[in-house]
């Protein structure tokens, strides 16, 4: 398809302005990670050459995504309550899946530059997968740490997804993806270490406690505390960078924070005041709703950033959450069946997320005159 006909189709999510702007997009990034630059980069440069030049970069991204999906569902099968005894191999398997994902995530961009196939779609596909992967890896990581299905594990997962959103918001505002000194690579190795610790020392290791004068805390809760506080520090750095180097107004950035902040607030309220103890009755449907919604809103921000467009503060898919709040707050759960609603809403959210991914990918491949999972023969363009 010729790019002159890029507006000869309809898209729910990609505006005509976005179609024009993505043709101008250029990635700008900064990685200050010692491990990435001085250690892993040598391995990744070697590994990417194992792929044939006919191999599409997005296919590498997809392989990494699939490895995390498999890890999540295998863990869910053996540890549906995110704790308890599981086969020892599972912990090594989860660590291996993160390593595979890390390698694929590092090599997809290298492959794109190697075969001259870099595009805004590639970055969107990469970071869009990362948004969903954040939910999945945090769930499996906390399962190895024996945290269990509860408000603590749920909040920690969504908090890290919020941190990921803030990193994207910083790039949206400044135009630069700053991975920092402690970035994704270090986080991934930390999670691998958690899985490996459980393999060697067993599940009970995480229930040991450490005392700080009169304060006592379990090892697994200490890890989560470090994770949460690290997220706070990261968000503060993001905010400082936005205020200092941002090209967008403060009001625009606040508006961009509205949907994700509402999601975080509603998730905490619903989980705490559910009339049916949702963490016991439909935990993975409930948590999955917010995992997917966080990934969806983040994906829309990434799309807006790459296409130099705007993120709407009103997300229609979130409107049913008003009914949940009313059902709990005003009607004490008697307005409708909360469990049934949770399950139905989960599938609605999932379908909307899949539709978003399909619509955006198919639209941008037409605009950019490329394929998503194969490389177009340049003689055909």
Curated annotation (Swiss-Prot):
Coiled-coil ranges from the UniProt annotation = none
What membrane topology does this protein have?
Multi-pass membrane protein
What GO molecular functions are on record for this protein?
Answer: phosphotransferase activity, for other substituted phosphate groups
Cellular compartment(s): Membrane
A GO CC term attached to the entry: membrane
Q: What are the entry keywords?
A: Membrane, Transferase, Transmembrane, Transmembrane helix
Q: Name any Gene Ontology BP term.
A: phospholipid biosynthetic process
Query: Which positions, given as ranges, span the membrane?
Result: 59-79, 84-104, 147-167, 190-210, 222-242, 250-270, 284-304, 311-331, 344-364
Instruction: Tell me if Cell membrane is a UniProt keyword of this record.
Output: no
Q: Principal localization?
A: membrane
Listed InterPro entries: CDP-OH_P_trans, CDP-OH_PTrfase_TM_dom, CDP_ALCOHOL_P_TRANSF_CS, CHOPT
One of the Pfam families matching this protein, by short name: CDP-OH_P_transf
Q: Which family does it belong to?
A: Belongs to the CDP-alcohol phosphatidyltransferase class-I family.
Q: What is this protein called?
A: Uncharacterized CDP-alcohol phosphatidyltransferase class-I family protein 1
- State the species of origin: Dictyostelium discoideum
């Amino acid at each position: 398809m010729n790019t002159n006909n890029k507006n000869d189709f309809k898209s729910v999510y990609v505006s005509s302005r976005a179609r024009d702007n993505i043709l101008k997009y250029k990635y700008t990034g900064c990685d200050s990670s010692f491990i990435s630059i001085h250690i892993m980069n040598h391995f990744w440069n070697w590994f990417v050459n194992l792929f044939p030049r006919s191999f599409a970069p997005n296919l590498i991204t997809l392989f990494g995504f699939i490895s995390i999906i498999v890890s999540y569902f295998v863990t869910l099968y053996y540890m549906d309550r995110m704790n308890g005894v599981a086969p020892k191999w599972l912990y090594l398997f989860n660590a291996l899946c993160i390593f595979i994902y890390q390698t694929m995530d590092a090599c997809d961009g290298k492959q794109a530059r190697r075969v001259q196939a870099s595009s805004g779609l590639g970055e969107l596909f990469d970071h869009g997968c990362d948004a969903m992967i954040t939910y999945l890896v945090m769930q499996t990581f906390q399962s190895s740490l024996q945290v269990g299905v509860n408000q603590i594990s749920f909040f920690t997962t969504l908090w890290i997804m919020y941190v990921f959103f803030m990193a994207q918001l910083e790039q949206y505002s400044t135009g630069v993806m700053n991975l920092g000194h402690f970035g994704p690579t270090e986080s991934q190795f930390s999670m691998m270490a958690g899985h490996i610790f459980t393999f060697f020392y067993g599940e009970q290791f995480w229930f040991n406690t450490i005392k700080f004068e009169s304060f006592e805390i379990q090892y697994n809760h200490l890890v989560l505390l470090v994770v949460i506080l690290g997220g706070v520090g990261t968000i503060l750095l993001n905010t400082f960078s936005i205020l200092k180097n941002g090209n967008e107004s403060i009001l625009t950035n606040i508006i961009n924070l509205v949907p994700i902040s509402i999601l975080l607030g509603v998730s905490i309220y619903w989980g705490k005041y559910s009339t049916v103890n949702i963490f016991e009755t439909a935990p993975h449907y409930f948590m999955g709703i917010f995992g997917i919604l966080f990934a969806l809103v983040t994906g829309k921000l990434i799309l807006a950033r790459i296409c130099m467009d705007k993120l709407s503060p009103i997300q229609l898919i979130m409107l049913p959450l008003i009914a949940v709040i009313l059902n709990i707050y005003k009607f004490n759960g008697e307005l409708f069946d909360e469990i049934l609603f949770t399950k139905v809403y989960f599938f609605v959210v999932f379908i909307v997320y899949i539709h978003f991914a399909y619509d955006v990918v198919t639209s941008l491949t037409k605009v950019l005159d490329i394929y998503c999972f194969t490389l177009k023969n340049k003689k055909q363009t």
